[in-house]
């Protein structure tokens, strides 16, 4: 039976019922709905709505219900209730009879779903931080194992300057650290409890909302009932953080796809995260990475969809807000899966250090070193830049790297160039010179790895 049937003389059309009902997706809020109900039972007992005996009877029944569904909350889907609130109430009534009908006193589904969603989002933030940390651990482990793997760094997908695979790994560690921080910040703003705000104007019972908030794991009750039942900022913040993180994961995946390609051959992905072709027996496709890259669109879409849904809503609650759920549920599952698969991809990755070094020696990625060499000889950088550009054109015409040019050839471009230029042009010199904080100098990279291990508690 619907929770609101008294006003209506006709039953809802079956098509509308399916269109309106949300149990098929909001069943995921079952544990939060039960926990919120336990907290609410205590709150209304404090103002005399329930006796202490009734309170205890309800709490026992709610805890029993929680224990029954916790191993597999999907069993709820066998039911035909309108939503998770209706389902919990109906099951409670089955257990305690008419006493179960007293629980909703002073409460609206508007503040009920608001607190359910906020509690669910808090749980998700913690779980996702754990998944981020796991991927960061894998990145640090991979970096530590590949500190000597010199490879080309790219701008515009063209070889630019030499880096190491370890430095590449640590770049993604830093991106994920910002994602972790964003979740921490978002979690702080989830510490206000909307329960007790009623439908929009507040509850008619003088409950202690701050005590209720603390019972439910919040810091304090919200300050404005209109805002409380209308607020979905916590959902938007999770979706926003997920979207930014999925940008990072998509770029991570794209890099690995490129490095794994036959054109690069910098590394090989494990058989555990690749698949074959139904037609071409030689293929080994980077499907795990391609799916991470592809699934980013689902998460972006959830954020865009909810922003669009909320932007024109008047205060307070509107049924449009039911559309916050499917997007966030799917986005959080997708983000979590991508973080887990990203870590799996790194487990058995095999970097071809000979090939990465060979590639780093190509493409004139030491040209900047030659320009810096000229600057050290007293030539203004802009002039040095032009001189080196001409030298590169000459080397390209000879199909030789810069370091293969003779001193006499170098002197065609400027007389200050001498024998001391050759050590400067080596890959090792290119790396060593980048010794400022954050640079690719091997010692700086080692320091970054050690700092990350301390941060991760490794």
Curated annotation (Swiss-Prot):
Enzyme class, top EC level, equals lyase
Catalytic reaction equation(s): 2-(N(omega)-L-arginino)succinate = fumarate + L-arginine
Q: Which domain of life is it from?
A: Bacteria
A GO CC term attached to the entry: cytosol
Keywords noted in UniProt = Amino-acid biosynthesis, Arginine biosynthesis, Cytoplasm, Lyase
Biological processes annotated in GO: arginine biosynthetic process via ornithine; L-arginine biosynthetic process
Q: Name one GO molecular function term.
A: argininosuccinate lyase activity
Where is the protein localized? Cytoplasm
- Protein's pathway: Amino-acid biosynthesis; L-arginine biosynthesis; L-arginine from L-ornithine and carbamoyl phosphate: step 3/3
Q: What is its main location?
A: cytoplasm
Q: Which Gene3D superfamilies does the record associate with it?
A: Fumarase/aspartase (C-terminal domain) (1.10.40.30), Fumarase/aspartase (Central domain) (1.20.200.10), Fumarase/aspartase (N-terminal domain) (1.10.275.10)
Q: State which Enzyme Commission number(s) the record gives.
A: 4.3.2.1
Q: Which SUPFAM superfamilies match?
A: L-aspartase-like
Q: Which family does the UniProt entry place this protein in? A: Belongs to the lyase 1 family. Argininosuccinate lyase subfamily.
* NCBIfam families linked: argH, PRK12308.1
Record HAMAP family: Arg_succ_lyase
Descriptive protein name: Argininosuccinate lyase
Its source organism is Actinobacillus pleuropneumoniae serotype 3 (strain JL03)
Q: What does the organism's lineage look like at the top?
A: Bacteria, Pseudomonadati, Pseudomonadota, Gammaproteobacteria, Pasteurellales
Q: Which gene encodes it?
A: argH
């Amino acid at each position: 039976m619907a929770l609101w049937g008294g006003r209506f003389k006709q039953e809802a059309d079956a098509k509308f019922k399916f269109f309106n009902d949300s149990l098929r997706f909001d069943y995921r809020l079952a544990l939060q709905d039960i926990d919120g109900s336990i907290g609410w039972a205590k709150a209304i007992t404090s103002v005399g709505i329930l006796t202490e005996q009734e309170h205890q009877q309800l709490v026992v029944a709610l805890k029993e219900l929680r224990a029954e569904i916790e191993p597999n909350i999907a069993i709820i889907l066998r039911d035909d209730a309108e939503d998770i609130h209706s389902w919990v109430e109906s099951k409670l009534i089955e257990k305690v009879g008419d006493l179960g009908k007293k629980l909703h006193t002073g409460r609206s589904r508007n503040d009920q779903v608001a607190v359910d969603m906020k509690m669910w989002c808090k749980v998700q933030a913690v779980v996702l931080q754990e998944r981020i940390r796991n991927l960061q651990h894998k990145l640090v482990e991979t970096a530590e194992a590949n500190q000597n793997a010199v490879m080309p760094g790219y701008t515009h997908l063209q070889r630019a300057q030499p880096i190491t695979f370890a430095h590449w790994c640590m770049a993604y560690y830093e991106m994920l650290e910002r994602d972790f921080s964003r979740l921490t910040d978002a979690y702080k703003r989830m510490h206000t409890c909307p329960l007790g705000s009623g439908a929009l104007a507040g509850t008619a019972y003088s409950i202690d909302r701050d005590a209720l908030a603390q019972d439910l794991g919040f810091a304090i009750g919200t300050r404005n009932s209109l805002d409380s039942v209308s607020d979905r900022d916590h959902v938007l913040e999770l979706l926003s953080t997920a979207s930014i993180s999925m940008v990072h994961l998509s770029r991570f995946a794209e890099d690995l796809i490129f490095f794994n390609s036959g054109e690069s051959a910098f590394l090989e992905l494990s058989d555990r995260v690749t698949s074959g072709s139904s037609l071409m027996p030689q293929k080994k496709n980077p499907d795990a990475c391609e799916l991470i890259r592809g699934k980013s669109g689902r998460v972006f879409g959830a954020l865009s969809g909810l922003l669009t849904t909320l932007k024109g809503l008047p205060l307070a609650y509107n049924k449009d807000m039911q559309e916050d759920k499917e997007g966030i549920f799917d986005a959080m599952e997708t983000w979590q899966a991508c973080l887990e698969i990203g870590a799996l991809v790194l487990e058995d990755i095999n970097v071809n250090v000979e090939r990465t070094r060979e590639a780093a020696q190509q493409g004139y990625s030491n040209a900047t070193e030659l320009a810096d060499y000229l600057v050290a000889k007293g030539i203004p950088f802009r002039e040095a830049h032009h001189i080196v550009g001409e030298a590169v054109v000459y080397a390209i015409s000879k199909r030789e790297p810069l370091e293969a040019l003779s001193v006499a050839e170098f002197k065609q471009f400027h007389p200050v160039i001498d024998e001391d230029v050759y050590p400067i042009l080596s890959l090792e010199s290119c790396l060593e010179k980048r010794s400022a904080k954050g640079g690719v100098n091997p010692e700086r990279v080692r320091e970054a790895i050690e700092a990350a291990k301390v941060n991760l508690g490794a």
